[in-house]
Amino acid sequence: MYLSKADDQDWKYPQTEPYASGFLEVENGTHRVFWSEYGNPCGEPVICVHGGPGGGSDAFVARFFDPKRFRVLMFDQRGCGKSTPSASSNDLDDALRNNTTSHLIDDMNKLRVHRKIDTPMHVFGGSWGSTLSLSYAIAHPSNVRSLILRGIFLCRRKDSVSYTHLTLPTKA
């Protein structure tokens, strides 16, 4: 069964407010990564990796995890959401500068250290976030307890061709 945000009564875990949030300066201060945490500050750590590229984190995703059991860390990747500079502003060139998969993997690890997460994390990613989650797990296997992937997009040539040539039917 597909559950939308409108199906609030069907979700097992309630919407909660973050207990902490802030910005992490990366790349000598030229980028600031927004982060927020939900659930139990002493719980099993989960890092949520949003899709895109160009998307942003959504507090709704924290509802996948029991707030009594898990410490859910969300962040907006460089150029996305509340992170600065934003690709949706006039700072597009700045947002894209030093913004590669390697930079994002480093940001995830810096964020883990910044938030004092010293045990392996569950890594939860969707769409482009699944690709970034896999890349993080390859780069830092000792920091990953499990991978939870949804809507997997692997950035293979055939995936990209299918994605860029997707057309919707139009009315005649």
Predicted regions, residues:
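Conserved HGGG/HGGXW glycine-rich cap/lid loop of the alpha/beta-hydrolase fold
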Residues: 27-85
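N-terminal targeting or regulatory segments adjacent to alpha/beta-hydrolase or S9 domains
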Residues: 1-11
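N-terminal cap/lid segment of alpha/beta-hydrolase-fold proteins
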Residues: 11-32
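Conserved acidic catalytic loop of the alpha/beta-hydrolase fold
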Residues: 103-120
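Conserved small/polar residues in nucleotide/adenosyl-binding loops
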Residues: 164-170
